[in-house]
């Protein structure tokens, strides 16, 4: 929106030659933008990582990546969008005020001197495995031998649950898909949990796009500002039961950023190691979070114009986590003794560690979350936790535990 205004001051024809692109747009909108980009009618596009994979776009001369995209693989894939026709192209990485971005600038060897990240996944996670078993049964009857051979020993234990929930039916020849809808629709490649929330213009009924259910509380709450192809809308109402947000067009000079609070309970500690005078652990946790308000920020300057409260329900996530504790002696040695100083230092360590983990594990910054507290009741110490943002865990926290020395050393260097 601001880019189009600036371009219009240079040449009135330029605003129509740039556009925005993201995965939440309607399919017909995305296809039209892709055609315009291929034909040259569009000279530039501001996009999320939705253009990173699966779309053959040629003729691009340059790619500017604003902010670390999450992994080395993503950065090279995005840069690789340019130069497919003429053989030469320009790839630029523009760092943000972020610990990971600064770390990459100061340690370019992590980009140019190493292979892409190791793929991390927990294939036994029932939240991931269940939909895949259903999709396999929809292709042909799934036998116990097939389930064990292709999906692992834990797969057979999930089949009765899928039967009980009405997805599969047991027959002498195996398990069958029973529903009329497609089994593959159970698999959300965008990582959301639950049905996507539809963004609808209230006065016309026009569908503007969708947002993942997991992001709806922070991106489609009442009062949220939503920008669609240069037009600005404000969320009039969010109906979580119907998975619909009603929007109205507005003219405004501010954006919105949700604020939330979070806490966690350690359900089970699988492994604990001494970590200096503290400890390093991994296990199962339950994270409770709630969006409590949002900030209004002026577009041009980032100035905070105000804060509005929200009344949204709590969300609970049972997942895998890695956490470490800091002893009182360590805090005293570092001359961090006041409660607010301890909380601030722990929060800084939490954000830095979240930012650095994608360099070591094939995850996006938004695949993981973090919580820190000066004194947690389950540990009795200052505790910093990083958890998988997917129900049941995706393997990122367990990977972090294994490479903790490399990961937390990089975090310390970034701080």
Q: What do the predicted segments below correspond to?
A:
Residues 88-91, 97-115, 122, 127, ...:
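Extended Lys/Arg-rich polyanion-binding regions
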